[in-house]
A protein has these predicted regions:
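Class I S-adenosyl-L-methionine-dependent methyltransferase catalytic core
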Residues: 1-177
């Protein structure tokens, strides 16, 4: 796992081979952050939420680029521990890893975020419900951006908050505002 830009640029973290997580590919992540860098000034007091954080690849990228606060929610204990280890290695207090279910977090949090990224397992039965839940719970700040990573089998173009979809190989990102 590689950090693409920011204060931890080019840092690498070895993800254990036995991980069940499917990390966002470097190719997809780099292209996504190229798009985001034109939309978000990460050094402007941004608070972010990384749901279904997996390896924490997006979380460390957000911290590296200057986010003030990143909450990283991951259910799997091994993945959660890896995220904690990465954040300890870079000695940051900008990321709060939480071991828990993404849906329960959405339901219980009172925080609002400038940026939300969700990368649930592509085969998750209720993946299609995530955008509705984010907006029903009011988790985005005004002018906030929510991105959902998903496989080709999902199409969110009819969602009232959908603005665009980007595809990089087998990785799809749907953008919502």
């Amino acid at each position: 796992m590689r950090v693409i830009s920011g204060i931890y640029k080019r840092r690498r973290f070895d993800v254990p081979k036995n991980f069940k997580a499917r990390p966002t590919t470097d190719f997809a992540k780099e292209n996504l952050f190229n798009v985001l860098s034109n939309r978000i000034d990460f050094e402007d007091g941004i608070t972010a939420l990384d749901l279904f954080a997996g390896t924490g690849s997006i979380s460390i990228e957000l911290v590296s680029r200057g986010c003030d606060k990143v909450i990283s929610v991951e259910k799997d204990p091994q993945h959660y521990s890896f995220i904690c280890k990465v954040m300890q290695e870079v000695k940051t207090d900008k990321c709060l890893p939480i071991r828990g279910d993404g849906f329960k977090f959405i339901d219980s949090t009172r925080e609002k975020f400038d940026f939300i990224f969700a990368d649930p397992p592509y085969a998750l039965p209720n993946l299609k419900d995530i955008p509705d839940l984010i907006f029903e719970k009011g988790l985005l700040k005004e002018d906030g951006l929510f991105i959902l990573e998903h496989g080709k089998d999902h199409n969110f173009e009819e969602h009232p908050h959908f603005v665009e979809q980007r595809q990089y190989g087998s990785v799809n990102f749907s953008f919502f505002v």
